[in-house]
Regions:
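Signature of long, low-cysteine stretches enriched in small and polar/charged residues
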Residues: 60, 99-154
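Bacterial N-terminal signal peptides that target proteins for export
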Residues: 2-11
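Bacterial signal peptide processing site
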Residues: 22-25
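Surface-exposed amphipathic alpha-helical segments
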Residues: 59, 154-188
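C-terminal motif of bacterial Sec signal peptides marking the signal peptidase cleavage site
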Residues: 17-20
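Post-signal peptide N-terminal segment of mature Sec-exported envelope proteins
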Residues: 29-50
Length: 188
């Protein structure tokens, strides 16, 4: 009888342990990407362009022989492409292009908020478009004095567009672009 009680207890304990060992898979929490970029220090663009502005000092200038430099962010693998055009009765077509270009990203974008920029004392007017979503370009802008000068810029990352991953870098570059817009001066 003692053996039967012991066997029953052993069998019951074994069954409970075997049934209790089935572990439920818990989803792992998603890690947040922590990117840290240096505090920006700004310096003046070379004196060979029809404009002046300040840019982040760890940015590399590319295509200096062009009418506007491209700003390459090596730590982010991103480039802010700049294009300058002298106005010759073509401001309507340039403004049309500047407003249509962000619209081409609407297929992948969730929204494209725009911020109007005006500095009448410096004759600088423009718009900054922030593309929210998995679009190829996360940021576009233009600046003009509406009579002689027109500057456009587009930000591209050298990676597959994944907004959640590149958002911290895009926000960092956006602050640099706002600083560029605020410090831009046309040369006459």
């Amino acid at each position: 009888m003692r053996v039967a009680k012991w066997a029953k207890a052993f069998l019951l304990t074994t069954i409970v342990l075997l049934l209790g060992c089935d572990s439920v898979q818990q989803p792992k929490p998603k890690a947040q990407l922590r990117l840290q970029y240096p505090e920006p220090k700004y310096k003046q663009v070379p004196d060979i362009y029809p404009f002046d502005f300040k840019y982040n000092d760890w940015v590399e200038l590319k295509g200096i022989a062009k009418t506007a430099p491209d700003l390459y962010y090596p730590k982010m693998k991103a480039t802010l492409y700049l294009s300058y055009v002298g106005l010759e009765n073509n401001i309507d077509s340039l403004l049309n292009d500047a407003y249509q270009l962000p619209g081409k990203h609407m297929i992948k974008a969730q929204e494209i908020p725009e911020r109007v920029f005006m500095a009448p004392e410096k004759r600088v007017y423009g718009t900054l478009f922030t593309v929210v979503g998995n679009a190829a370009s996360q940021l576009q802008f233009f600046l003009t004095d509406s009579t002689d000068h027109f500057l456009m810029g587009s930000l591209y990352f050298y990676s597959r567009p994944n907004y959640d991953s590149i958002m911290p870098a895009a926000k960092y570059v956006e602050r640099d672009v706002v600083h560029l817009m605020e410090t831009l001066r046309w040369k006459d």
